[in-house]
């Protein structure tokens, strides 16, 4: 039999601090409505989603404060770098996310911006709750203990 190939996913931007600053409850994949120059700029790998978040307006989910810099070769047809971008989701998904945000006090934060195997730009969106300082310290201690435990087990045998 022929070997099945793994889907080729190209990560363009990642929010590394999100897992430290937030307790992630659920993740969901969303498409993004982009212009041509935005897609080219993301492919060049210079976009950042670290300070961004998602919010609901008029029954739709929007990505706010994501920085996709201008594409240098586009001269006057360029886009605005920090404009709000519409996230493409099904109505059931939107209702679920809006319910979590309004009732449970959760936040929608982007974890990863990537291109799927078909070349479409996707955003991995997390439903999360912000951690307090003592929660961050506790998770850091737990992570450090896991590393130390691994080192001890490797050293012994």
UniProtKB/Swiss-Prot annotation:
Residues 135-151 have a biased composition (Basic and acidic residues). GO terms for cellular component: cytosol. It comes from the Bacteria. Residues 133-157 are annotated as: Disordered. Pfam families: SmpB. Its main location: cytoplasm. Keywords: Cytoplasm, RNA-binding. InterPro entries: SmpB, SsrA-bd_prot, SsrA-bd_prot_CS. GO terms for molecular function: RNA binding. One of its GO terms (biological process) is trans-translation. PANTHER family: SSRA-BINDING PROTEIN, TMRNA-BINDING COMPONENT OF TRANS-TRANSLATION TAGGING COMPLEX. Required for rescue of stalled ribosomes mediated by trans-translation. Binds to transfer-messenger RNA (tmRNA), required for stable association of tmRNA with ribosomes. tmRNA and SmpB together mimic tRNA shape, replacing the anticodon stem-loop with SmpB. tmRNA is encoded by the ssrA gene; the 2 termini fold to resemble tRNA(Ala) and it encodes a 'tag peptide', a short internal open reading frame. During trans-translation Ala-aminoacylated tmRNA acts like a tRNA, entering the A-site of stalled ribosomes, displacing the stalled mRNA. Belongs to the SmpB family. This is SsrA-binding protein. The gene is smpB.
């Amino acid at each position: 039999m022929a070997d099945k190939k793994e889907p080729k996913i190209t990560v363009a931007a990642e929010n590394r601090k999100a897992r430290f600053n937030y307790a992630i409850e659920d993740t969901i994949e969303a498409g993004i409505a982009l212009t041509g120059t935005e897609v080219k700029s993301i492919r060049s790998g210079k976009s950042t989603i670290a300070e961004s978040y998602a919010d609901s307006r008029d029954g739709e989910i929007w990505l706010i404060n994501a920085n996709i810099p201008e594409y240098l070769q586009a001269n006057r047809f360029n886009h605005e770098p920090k404009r709000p971008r519409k996230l493409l989701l099904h109505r059931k998904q939107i209702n679920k996310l809006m319910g979590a945000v309004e009732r449970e006090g959760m936040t929608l934060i982007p974890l990863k911006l990537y291109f799927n195997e078909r070349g479409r730009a996707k955003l991995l969106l997390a439903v999360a709750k912000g951690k307090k300082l003592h929660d961050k310290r506790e998770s850091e201690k737990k992570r450090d203990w896991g590393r130390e435990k691994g080192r001890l087990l490797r050293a012994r045998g």
